[in-house]
Amino acid sequence: MAVNKGYTGYNKELNAMAATHAYIRLSTLMSQIESWQATRASVLTHLGVMLNGVSKLGERSFFSRTKRFGAHTSDGDEIFCDLGGEAVTQILSRLTVALQSARGEGAQTRNAKRGAAPGTSQVENEEQGQTDQTLAISNAVAELMIFVRTKDFTMNECYTQDSFEAKYNLKWEGSS
């Protein structure tokens, strides 16, 4: 008799986690953050690309009752990170807010109320604001890089296939 492939021990909590948490290879996450750090000098010209990258970071529905965690890898030793943990979610939210602010989301409404051409002091303030925005983005990217290198993140939010299944008491039945 053939055994249907899938997890035993899979439950509602894991189903919700699979739907709401994004997972990403640790190597891909590090490369992406390094790429964002490299754009530091021209970050304001790459806002849309960075914002899109942050919003699409990782993959949801990475596993399910019938889809094995990390199954699309050639071996089970590759490390995947959960981007749905509270700390990393807060850091990514701060980065998103910094990018949205620098992009001017909300500024169009404020500027429309002015109605007059900007004066010299207003232009100087806007130039200072751009410097502040660049600094806020750079700080948020640096904070993310520092965090993903911490033992707390790598030990609690990063998994191989075996460590994920052991943590959540999952047993894969059938062939992968």
UniProtKB/Swiss-Prot annotation:
InterPro entries: TMV-like_coat (IPR001337), TMV-like_coat_sf (IPR036417). Its main location: virion. The keyword Zinc does not apply. The keyword Secreted does not apply. It comes from the Viruses. Pfam families: TMV_coat (PF00721). Residues 103-132 are annotated as: Disordered. Keywords: Capsid protein, Helical capsid protein, Virion. Transmembrane segments: none annotated. One of its GO terms (molecular function) is structural molecule activity. Capsid protein self-assembles to form rod-shaped virions about 20 nm in diameter with a central canal enclosing the viral genomic RNA. Isoform N-CP does not seem to be required for virion formation and systemic infection in host plant. This is Capsid protein. It comes from Soil-borne wheat mosaic virus (strain United States/Nebraska/1981) (SBWMV). The gene is CP.
